Curated annotation (Swiss-Prot):
Keywords: Methylation, Ribonucleoprotein, Ribosomal protein, RNA-binding, rRNA-binding. HAMAP family: Ribosomal_uL11 (MF_00736). PANTHER family: 60S RIBOSOMAL PROTEIN L12 (PTHR11661), LARGE RIBOSOMAL SUBUNIT PROTEIN UL11M (PTHR11661:SF1). It holds the Pfam family Ribosomal_L11. One or more lysine residues are methylated. This is Large ribosomal subunit protein uL11. Part of the ribosomal stalk of the 50S ribosomal subunit. Interacts with L10 and the large rRNA to form the base of the stalk. L10 forms an elongated spine to which L12 dimers bind in a sequential fashion forming a multimeric L10(L12)X complex. The keyword Ribonucleoprotein applies. Gene3D superfamilies: Ribosomal protein L11, C-terminal domain, Ribosomal protein L11/L12, N-terminal domain. One of its GO terms (biological process) is translation. SMART domains: RL11 (SM00649). Coiled coil: none annotated. The keyword rRNA-binding applies.
Length: 141
């Protein structure tokens, strides 16, 4: 018989750097999960993606065991990394803060494909381009 899921927790954590401190501790503690076990497993699985923020969805079961699914890094994080920026524009419609090329856009779209609701790489590229536009980053040919 399948285990009964009693909670779903969504977090965005730095790769390889999950600690029992907030936000991880309180989120998992209220479901009675072994926090150190999660931190060790998460850090082991994300060690090769250092410097990225990795979203994770944790399923907590009735017997207080857990499983988790790693997602691809948020589009905004990948775009900022490609453009070499720390943050997007405060006024994206007025102030442009950076540029990315079509090739970089395609690379980001291919990275995000598993998590995007897109049928083709072209439609994924237009989604990522929209995110870039809303951050004040222009896409060049």
């Amino acid at each position: 018989m399948a285990k009964k899921v009693v909670g779903m927790i969504k977090l965005q954590l730095p790769a390889g750097k999950a600690t029992p401190a907030p936000p991880v501790g309180p989120a998992l503690g209220q479901h009675g999960v072994n926090i150190m076990a999660f931190c060790k497993e998460y850090n082991a699985k994300t060690a090769n993606q250092a410097g990225m923020t990795i979203p994770v969805i944790i399923s907590v079961y009735q017997d207080r065991s857990f499983s988790f699914i790693l997602k691809t890094p948020p589009a905004a994080v990948l775009i900022k990394k490609a453009a070499g920026l720390d943050s997007g524009s405060g006024e994206p419609n007025k102030t442009k803060v950076g540029k990315i090329t079509k090739a970089q856009l395609k690379e980001i779209a291919e990275t995000k494909m598993p998590d995007l609701n897109a049928g083709s790489v072209e439609s994924a590229m237009s989604m990522i381009a929209g995110t870039a536009r809303s951050m004040g980053i222009t896409v060049e040919e």
